């Protein structure tokens, strides 16, 4: 049963400065996410925006379900592309524990078109 949904849309050009500033990348993205971006070649900005949007969409989806304050950073929410092209969340630290304790399933889709990236998350039990 669907417990919650989250959606986030973001302007792709917001991430131009991330390519010139490694500290910004390191603040929001895991090393694995950054390495995967570097292998991408074309479409790096769209991918960055999509991953960031997915992290924000998950937080929005979880917010109404969480009764206690948890400590997390956006790096605790990792976006992984599987060999067939679909994407999943790889969670770390307190947010991972919370999802496991609540026995929730997460579904994610990301799309981008020129100026914008959007992510949509469904949380089910």
Swiss-Prot record:
GO MF: holo-[acyl-carrier-protein] synthase activity; magnesium ion binding
Enzymatic reactions: apo-[ACP] + CoA = holo-[ACP] + adenosine 3',5'-bisphosphate + H(+)
Membrane-crossing residue ranges in chain numbering: none
Group of enzyme by EC: transferase
Cell compartment(s), UniProt: Cytoplasm
Gene Ontology, cellular component aspect: cytoplasm
E.C. numbers: 2.7.8.7
Entry coiled-coil feature ranges: none
Keyword Lipid metabolism annotated: yes
UniProt KW keywords: Cytoplasm, Fatty acid biosynthesis, Fatty acid metabolism, Lipid biosynthesis, Lipid metabolism, Magnesium, Metal-binding, Transferase
Domain of life according to the entry: Bacteria
A Gene Ontology biological process term: fatty acid biosynthetic process
Residues that bind Mg(2+): 8, 56
Pfam families according to UniProt: ACPS
Role of this protein: Transfers the 4'-phosphopantetheine moiety from coenzyme A to a Ser of acyl-carrier-protein.
Family from the record: Belongs to the P-Pant transferase superfamily. AcpS family.
Entry protein name: Holo-[acyl-carrier-protein] synthase
Organism name: Borrelia hermsii (strain HS1 / DAH)
Source species taxonomy: Bacteria, Pseudomonadati, Spirochaetota, Spirochaetia, Spirochaetales
């Amino acid at each position: 049963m669907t417990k919650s949904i989250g959606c986030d849309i973001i302007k792709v050009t917001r991430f131009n400065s991330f390519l010139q500033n490694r500290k910004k990348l390191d603040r929001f993205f895991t090393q694995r996410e950054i390495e995967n971006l570097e292998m991408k070649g074309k479409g790096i900005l769209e991918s960055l925006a999509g991953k960031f949007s997915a992290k924000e969409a998950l937080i929005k989806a979880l917010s109404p379900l969480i009764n206690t304050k948890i400590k997390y950073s956006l790096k605790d929410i990792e976006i992984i592309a599987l060999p067939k092209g679909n994407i999943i969340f790889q969670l770390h630290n307190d947010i991972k524990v919370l999802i496991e304790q609540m026995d929730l399933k997460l579904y994610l889709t990301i799309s981008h078109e020129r100026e914008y990236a959007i992510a949509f998350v469904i949380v089910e039990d």
